[in-house]
Regions:
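Solvent-exposed, flexible loop/coil residues
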Residues: 109-111, 264-267, 271-273
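Metallocofactor- and cofactor-centric catalytic cores in central/energy metabolism, strongly enriched
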Residues: 8-9, 13-16, 21, 36-42, ...
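Generic signal for short, ordered secondary-structure residues
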Residues: 24-26, 115, 155, 246, ...
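N-terminal Rossmann-like NAD(P) cofactor-binding subdomain of oxidoreductases
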Residues: 2-145, 149
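Short helix-capping/linker segments at secondary-structure and domain boundaries
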Residues: 140-142, 280-283
Length: 283
């Protein structure tokens, strides 16, 4: 079986964690791990594992247009938009792990985009909440408001995450609206500096005129089982509670400890989702 030739651009926390995960998959082959600084930790780790590296950023792909079949963009929301035009001209599929809104929103347990050339993985909070919000939206009447609050350990947030917080909020809100058809929503991201570091946790508040509770609960638990197939440390920590027509629930995501420690579930959830999309495309 021919291996899937993969490129990764962006060698920070997300890109490096993704690299380690992909190296464990026999059917994937990382042809290039590309950043801007040869002395970065991510590039150093990639070199130690025998992966070809470059510090030329997008220029590497311009000069080597056939170097991969699919590229994961782990840079930042602004650069990802610029990169997308280049990859489109080269016929390279893009899985965008930045909140750029440059491609079609993708949540692997909700929609399949096998024929799309550019898929946007939204955000960690989006991947944590949207599968459940989508399920809930099918079992309530007149859903009017959604609020999603995520907290992640400050130590798990790299430079790109900090630069992209406004993009994070806007992109997650837009994706929630797309998947639930609720216009009024609010997204909050808290970077928690506590020591010891906190796990990623996402709390959802859903307001509707009424909820069809039994089918809703069945739908939620079935969706969690589905999510755990590709996000093994995803768990419901506060089951749904309804008070005054507002449903509240919380999930927690631990990491696998591939690059950063287990508290960095925000890396795991978006990277595992990106890998799941790739498997569905080429499976």
């Amino acid at each position: 079986m021919e291996k899937i030739k993969i490129g990764i651009i962006g060698t920070g926390n997300i890109g490096t964690d993704l690299l380690i995960k992909i190296l464990k998959i026999p059917s994937f082959e990382v042809n290039i791990f590309c950043g801007r600084r040869l002395e970065s930790k991510g590039i150093g780790l990639a070199k130690s594992k025998g992966v070809q590296v470059s510090d030329r950023g997008i220029e590497h792909f311009i000069n080597n247009p056939k170097c991969c079949k699919i590229v994961y963009d782990c840079t930042n929301a602004i650069d990802a938009i610029k990169h997308a035009k280049i990859f489109k001209d080269q016929g390279i599929k893009v899985i965008d792990l930045t909140p750029s809104k440059g491609g079609s929103f993708c949540v692997p347990s909700v929609n399949e985009l096998k024929n799309e050339m550019n898929m946007n993985m939204i955000t960690c909070g989006g991947q944590a909440s949207i599968p459940l919000l989508y399920s809930i939206s099918k079992h309530c009447n007149q859903l009017t408001y959604i609020e999603v609050v995520s907290q992640i350990a400050s130590d798990s947030a790299g430079m790109a995450t900090r630069l992209n917080i406004d993009n994070y909020i806007e992109t997650t809100e837009n994706a929630i609206t797309q998947f639930t058809e609720v216009e009024k929503c609010k997204v909050i991201l808290n970077l928690n500096p506590a020591i010891p570091q906190v796990d990623m946790q996402t709390t959802m508040f859903i307001k509707a005129n009424s909820f069809d509770f039994e089918p809703l609960m069945g739908s939620i638990y079935n969706k969690i089982i589905e999510l755990k197939k590709y996000i093994p440390h995803y768990e419901l920590v506060m089951p749904p509670v309804i008070n005054n027509n507002v449903l509240v629930m919380s999930v927690r995501v631990k990491g696998s400890g591939d690059y950063l420690p287990e508290y960095a579930g925000n890396l795991d959830i978006i990277n595992c989702a990106a890998i799941e999309v790739t498997k569905k495309i080429y499976g």
